[in-house]
C-alpha cells in the first residue's frame, strides 16, 4: 500500500513539474510569435497600400466593424466578415484611404483572410494575404501576381468571378481549378469594398 502511495506521489510530482514547464515554454513563446505575426501583417499592409506612411485604428472604425457584421453577411458575398479597419495616412497625416482586413470561410480548405487597400477616390490599391492554406499548385496560386494583381487599380465596386477572360471592369478571372478560392478572395474583397462604401461614417 505504501509503495502504491509513493508511486502515485512521484507520478503526481512529475506531472506537475512537466505541466509547469510546458506552461512556462508556452508563455515564453507567445511574445515572439505575436511579434512575428505583427511584423508579417505590417509588411503585407505596406505591400497593399505602398503610398501610405502609417495606418491608424480609430474608435469610429472599430465601432463600424462591430456594427456592420450582420449587414455585410446579408449582402450575398458568402460567409464573409470585415475583421479590422484602419485609416491609411500620408507622412503629413492626410487621409489616403482605408486598409481593410476581411475574411471568407469559403475557401476550399476554409479560412482565407486578406487585406485590401481602398483609396479615398474609390480605387483598390492592392490585395495581400494574412491567412491562406489552400491546395498547393491550385488555390495557393491566389498569392501569385497573375491572380492577385488583377485587383490593383480596380474601381471599388461589386466584383464578380469569371472562369473565362475578364471582359468587364468588375470581373476577376478565376484561378484554373480553384474556383472556391477565387470566389472566397473576391467575396472577402467585396465585403471590404461594401464596408468602406456603406458603413464608414454612418
Show which residues each predicted segment covers.
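Flexible, solvent-exposed loop/hinge segments and secondary-structure transition points
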Residues: 2-202
Amino acid at each position: 500500500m505504501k509503495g502504491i502511495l509513493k508511486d502515485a506521489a512521484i507520478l503526481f510530482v512529475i506531472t506537475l513539474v512537466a505541466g509547469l514547464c510546458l506552461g512556462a515554454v508556452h508563455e515564453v513563446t507567445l511574445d515572439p510569435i505575436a511579434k512575428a505575426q505583427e511584423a508579417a501583417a505590417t509588411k503585407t499592409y505596406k505591400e497593399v497600400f505602398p503610398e501610405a506612411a502609417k495606418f491608424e485604428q480609430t474608435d469610429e472604425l472599430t465601432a463600424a466593424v462591430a456594427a456592420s457584421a450582420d449587414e455585410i453577411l446579408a449582402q450575398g458575398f458568402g460567409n464573409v466578415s470585415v475583421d479590422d479597419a484602419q485609416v491609411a495616412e500620408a507622412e503629413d497625416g492626410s487621409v489616403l484611404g482605408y486598409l481593410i482586413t476581411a475574411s471568407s470561410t469559403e475557401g476550399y480548405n476554409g479560412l482565407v483572410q486578406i487585406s485590401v487597400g481602398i483609396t479615398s477616390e474609390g480605387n483598390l490599391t492592392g490585395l495581400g494575404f494574412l491567412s491562406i492554406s489552400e491546395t498547393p499548385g491550385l488555390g495557393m496560386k491566389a498569392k501569385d501576381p497573375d491572380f492577385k494583381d488583377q485587383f490593383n487599380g480596380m474601381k471599388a465596386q461589386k466584383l464578380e468571378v469569371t472562369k473565362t477572360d475578364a471582359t468587364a471592369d468588375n470581373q476577376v478571372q478565376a484561378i484554373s481549378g480553384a474556383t472556391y478560392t477565387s470566389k472566397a478572395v473576391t467575396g472577402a474583397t467585396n465585403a471590404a469594398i461594401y464596408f468602406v462604401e456603406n458603413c464608414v461614417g454612418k
